[in-house]
């Protein structure tokens, strides 16, 4: 899998139906490719987090 493929190691979902899930991963310099609302710090390297709310979790990045 490429590093740009959407994936998430730390995903949390609500128990509602449909669930509301978000990824808490911190990535360097960019968010995953499927992220629409990405926020990054101004540090070098930048630490970025995706703030999208989805009804599923992406597959884990590691393993």
Swiss-Prot record:
Family listed: Belongs to the Bowman-Birk serine protease inhibitor family.
Lineage: Eukaryota, Viridiplantae, Streptophyta, Embryophyta, Tracheophyta
Site-annotated residues for Reactive bond for chymotrypsin: 41-42
Cysteines joined through disulfide linkages: 7-61, 8-23, 11-57, 13-21, 31-38, 35-50, 40-48
Pfam families: Bowman-Birk_leg
Keywords, in A-Z order: Disulfide bond, Protease inhibitor, Serine protease inhibitor
Site description Reactive bond for trypsin, residues in chain: 14-15
Spans traversing the lipid bilayer: none
Name recorded for this polypeptide: Bowman-birk type proteinase inhibitor 2
A GO CC term attached to the entry: extracellular region
Function of the protein: Inhibits trypsin, chymotrypsin, plasmin and factor XIIa. Does not inhibit factor Xa, thrombin, human plasma kallikrein, porcine pancreatic kallikrein and human urinary kallikrein.
One example GO MF annotation: serine-type endopeptidase inhibitor activity
Subunit details: Exists as a dimer in its native form.
SUPFAM superfamilies, per the entry: Bowman-Birk inhibitor, BBI
